[in-house]
Curated annotation (Swiss-Prot):
Keywords: ATP-binding, Ligase, Nucleotide-binding, Protein biosynthesis
GO biological process: translation
Lineage of the organism: Bacteria, Pseudomonadati, Pseudomonadota, Gammaproteobacteria, Thiotrichales
Protein name: Glutamyl-tRNA(Gln) amidotransferase subunit A
UniProt gene name: gatA
Gene3D superfamilies: Amidase signature (AS) domain
Amino acid sequence: MSYIKKLRARLDSGEVTAVELTKQYLAKIKDQDKSINSVITLCEAEALKEAENADAIISAGKQSLLTGIPILHKDLFCTKGIKTTAASKMLDNFVAPYDSTVTKNCKDQGMVTLGKLNMDEFAMGSTNEHSYYGAVSNPWDLDRVPGGSSGGSAAAVAAGFAPVSTGSDTGGSVRQPASFCGLTAMKPTYGSTSRFGMVAFASSFDQAGIFGHYAEDVAIMLDAISGECQYDSTCVGVKENHFTQDLEKDISGKVIGIDESLIKDLPAQIQEAVSKTLDNFKKLGAEIKSVKVPDLKEALSTYYIITPAEAAANLARYDGIRYGYRNPEARDLDELYRKSRTDGFGEEVKRRIMIGNYVLASSQYDSYYNKAQQLRKVMTDQINQIFEQVDVIFMPAAPSEAFKKGDKLDPVSAYLSDIYTIPANISGLPAIAFPIGFANDLPVGGQFMAKAFNDNVLTQMVTQYQNSYGIEEFILEQARI
């Protein structure tokens, strides 16, 4: 199943032009986003120009699969000539002089950029309540959060503002919002996609990801944005069609690992959805095997030591001098630094910078940062050992359905929202979230994790499931143009 391919057929047949399709999406955003607040910058003029170019390419018969397909980008991917804010006052007026590799690859495929999406400031958050531009609402219930940090990316696709969107995943920031908004989203293996031009949070964790309604669409998009990049030394080449190569193959004989201890304390409706999903995978020929996943609370602690440390280093560049917000009342250099950073950063960002500087202090380094890095290595080894027995590990994508705004203002409570997603980031492994059912009439998601560069196994597993048992058609009816 592929929404992209359905749009491709409409464009190629002449049923709709790229300009007409773009105008439909732009009109829907302008009409409906006031209540959702998913879009920071609407690129109407640029989008229509790109759509005109796409129509010319289609008329010449030189189109790719993605020519003329609209897309929205999380506002931490640099877009030449268009504001890139990272949802922060610090970058409120920053216009990137170049394109990120991710956005450039989309442009090169002929995609149409509709706009830039709201997010938690500098990708720090799990609710999308930490944005200089205001909180984002979940299209399923406007009083609830869409998840974070890529909440705008999830809400926009769920609302039907674009067929696909880009996001980033540092600790679950595409997978948890996908669960809350009824979408499929994937964080590929660390290094599969370039981080060049992506505003940094924690560089050894950050990875670009994709939101869509179907795993096939996510795979198509990941093929488009992945590959080698000379500007990112951590980016490795993956072969052409890496993510789509096995979509048509059945999954008979695949072994799914599950740690029952991670399921037993979940709400009853989510447990029921998990059980039904695993039963359906067994009907498709997969085998279920019990495994023991490393302690998730230790993973959470490890994550919230290392990532603030990396964030403190990365965000040191915002000093009010080179670019970004500058306090106009500072009387000397020291005051300029202090006032610009105090005013320019939001509370959650400042909290994580302070944690990061604390754990990196010479008196605390060995007790916190060094031990966390050692534990990261141990946990990665433990997870990789599990893959000697199984092809994928199944976990929930989130411990609950979307919760109400303001329910988790306590930082620790909010951090626990990522407890099931963080292991994939700690280990750099690929993981995909997909809808598995409903709890209290809201979507909930499951998640598969695989060993490094077995991304194709994840897209294969979920595509075969969605072709046979998925609930995406019901969800998509809420959003279809």
